[in-house]
Amino acid sequence: MLENVDLISAIITPFDDQLKINFTALERLTNHLIETGNTGFIIGGTTGETPTLTHAEKLGLYTRFAEIVAGRVPIIAGTGSNNTQATIDFTKEVRQIDGIIAALVVTPYYNKPNQRGMVAHFKTVARQADFPIMMYNIPGRTGVQMENATIVELSQEPNIIGIKQCTNLNDIGFLVENTPNDFAVYTGNDPETLGAVALGANGVASVASHIYGYQIRALLDAVKHGDLLKAGKLQRELTPKMEALFLYPSPAPVKAVLNAQNWSVGSPRLPILPLNQKEKLNLAHQLGVNHLADVQLHY
């Protein structure tokens, strides 16, 4: 299902001046990301500000996004929550949208189940929603971490097709080694891109691809062609820039860069604040330029 899908953009949700979804900006950005070499998308993830979207907004966003992509690359849509039944119900709605091939389901946050509870949650969602599921393990945001043994157990479930893993390279390597060959493992940490694919992961679910898509595409292609010197050089150049995009609560930094480049993606919704002028200048410095408008989006 995710063969040859190595660069997935966890795409932002553009807003207009009234903080309504800006579908014109979304279409323009989507086409650009495909042009830069993206081979898949996550819509409605963390970077997409899902917690600030209403149910109706999510359905409208996913439907329109699938129309924009028009089958060019696979789409995975966020449906997860800390309510198992609500996750099932929403996944059933989303599976009706043509072009969406799987649901991204995050570990249950706030109520913090134990490992047995997480197994029960994901198995119940996968079976009752009857739709391919990509698990999303991001303990830095959820307050709960799914252990490797739990993930390995869940990887045997037919409808659970993979994981977006936001922990460390040791975990990535363990999961690649101990899950079925058709279970897709993606790092959700941009600076781990080269390390993850070197360990056998499918690729990266990226935020930095909004800005450095050409470079990440070149890095992944260099690995495929066995040019590790080139891949290593690109990763070394990209890592501090990738880290800089998380200096402030995401997706505020990436939106600031895109707005400076006239992509008109708007501000984040509260509780995330847009960057102030001092923060923009600091971000530009960390990205190696004087102003965010100077960031080069082409490679």
Swiss-Prot record:
SUPFAM superfamilies: Aldolase. InterPro entries: Aldolase_TIM, DapA, DapA-like, Schiff_base-form_aldolases_AS. It is found in: Cytoplasm. PANTHER family: 4-HYDROXY-2-OXOGLUTARATE ALDOLASE, MITOCHONDRIAL (PTHR12128:SF66), DIHYDRODIPICOLINATE SYNTHASE (PTHR12128). Catalyzes the condensation of (S)-aspartate-beta-semialdehyde [(S)-ASA] and pyruvate to 4-hydroxy-tetrahydrodipicolinate (HTPA). Belongs to the DapA family. This is 4-hydroxy-tetrahydrodipicolinate synthase. It comes from Pediococcus pentosaceus (strain ATCC 25745 / CCUG 21536 / LMG 10740 / 183-1w). The gene is dapA.
